[in-house]
From Swiss-Prot:
Residues forming the catalytic site: K193 (proton acceptor)
Cellular component GO terms, alphabetical: cytosol
Keyword annotations of the record: Cytoplasm, Lipid biosynthesis, Lipid metabolism, NAD, NADP, Nucleotide-binding, Oxidoreductase, Phospholipid biosynthesis, Phospholipid metabolism
UniProt key word NADP: yes
Main location: cytoplasm
Gene Ontology process terms (BP): carbohydrate metabolic process; glycerol-3-phosphate biosynthetic process; glycerol-3-phosphate catabolic process; glycerophospholipid metabolic process; phospholipid biosynthetic process
Localization: Cytoplasm
Function summary: Catalyzes the reduction of the glycolytic intermediate dihydroxyacetone phosphate (DHAP) to sn-glycerol 3-phosphate (G3P), the key precursor for phospholipid synthesis.
Name used for this protein in its record: Glycerol-3-phosphate dehydrogenase [NAD(P)+]
Organism: Verminephrobacter eiseniae (strain EF01-2)
Binding site for sn-glycerol 3-phosphate: K105, G138, S140, K193, D246, S256, R257, N258
Length: 336
């Protein structure tokens, strides 16, 4: 297969490495927006900034410049950009005939008081409706995928061709790829788990204990499921890799940037200093308000998400955010 990976950050490089090492012998091109970055990686045969010490295999080539020039004959284009850059990338890809899959997890920021923000497939439907597109998601850290450590991910798309392309390109002895038609559920899981991981990091940073962590993860999963079902997702999707799986990993893993946001805020660090220290995008910070707004427009109850938004906006201290959640009145566990 001929595979194009657009975006040379940690995730783009990790999947490019995985595809280039595939036993089927794929030809993989990693495209970088910055020509100097592409030249540096070409010379060093590694991404020294994000994945130092992991050499590029011979099947991986570097490119920059005109992305459209790479499309002819491509079997799959993987978009490895943050959510904020997805719209522009999809506009650039509007004439592409190969299957396209994005890696970003989140909601595009709302543009007005009446807008709740958009999931990736909703953005694509607006700006590039003819694309055969989908999402590639699930519980994974880029570093572990790049190292070839065992991982399971989900290829989500209503299009058989997109799911088949992702499975063919990336399913290997170290990376299991499961197919799912429910792109709404997969994207909601990927977006909301980042917000919930901030809450869990806050819990751990305040040393509230393992009971509290388990409660947050479980009730967070309920919030995620309620929002997803309201948006048309299948509830069983949230018991899978992109729901429960990604939530547990992001909420508990030490490599999680969103969890680290909560940890640092619990220590009294400002949000600005926290984001500056990360060096990478923490999508939960940018998605939290949009998730809360979309939920409000749909009448979906998401108290943990609302508390995270109040914390990020500076309206609640870490201790007050916890007190707000614990001070809520009794409710049925199976509330709909």
């Amino acid at each position: 297969m001929k595979i194009i990976v657009s975006g040379a950050g940690a995730w783009g490089c990790a999947l490019a490495l995985s595809a280039a090492r595939h036993p089927a012998g794929h030809a993989v091109t990693l495209w970088a927006r910055d020509a100097s970055q592409a030249e540096r990686m070409r010379a060093e045969r590694q991404n020294a900034r994000y994945l130092p010490g992991l050499p590029f295999p011979p099947a991986l080539t570097l490119a920059s410049g005109d992305l459209a020039a790479l499309w002819p004959g491509a079997d799959l284009v993987i978009v490895a950009t943050p959510m904020a850059a997805l719209r522009g990338m999809l506009l650039a890809l509007h004439g592409c005939t190969a299957p396209v899959a994005w890696l970003c997890k989140g909601f595009e920021a709302a543009t007005g008081a009446e807008s709740g923000g958009l999931l990736a497939h909703e953005v694509q439907a607006l700006v590039a409706p003819r694309l055969l597109a989908g999402a590639f998601s699930g519980p994974s850290f880029a570093q572990e995928v790049a190292l070839g450590q065992p991982t399971a991910l989900v290829a989500a798309s209503p299009h058989d061709r997109v799911r088949a392309a992702l499975v063919g390109a990336l399913h290997s002895p170290s990376l299991r790829v499961y197919a799912n038609e429910d792109i709404v559920g997969v994207e909601v899981g990927g977006a909301v788990k980042n917000v919930l991981a901030i809450a869990t990091g806050l819990c751990d940073g305040l040393a509230l204990g393992l009971n509290a962590r388990a409660a947050l993860i479980t009730r967070g999963l309920a919030e995620m499921t309620r929002l997803g079902v309201a948006l048309g997702a299948r509830p069983e999707t949230f018991m899978g890799l992109s729901g429960l799986g990604d939530l547990v990993l992001t909420a508990t893993g030490d490599l999680s940037r969103n969890r680290r946001v909560g940890l640092l805020l619990a220590q009294g660090r400002s949000l600005a200093r926290t984001l500056e220290s990360l060096g990478h995008v923490a999508e939960g910070v940018y998605s939290a308000r949009t998730v809360a707004r979309r939920a409000a427009l749909l009448g979906v109850e998401m108290p943990i998400t609302r508390a995270v938004v109040a914390l990020l906006d500076g309206r609640l201290s870490p201790a007050d955010a916890v007190a707000l959640l614990m001070g809520r009145g009794p409710a049925s566990e199976l509330m709909h």
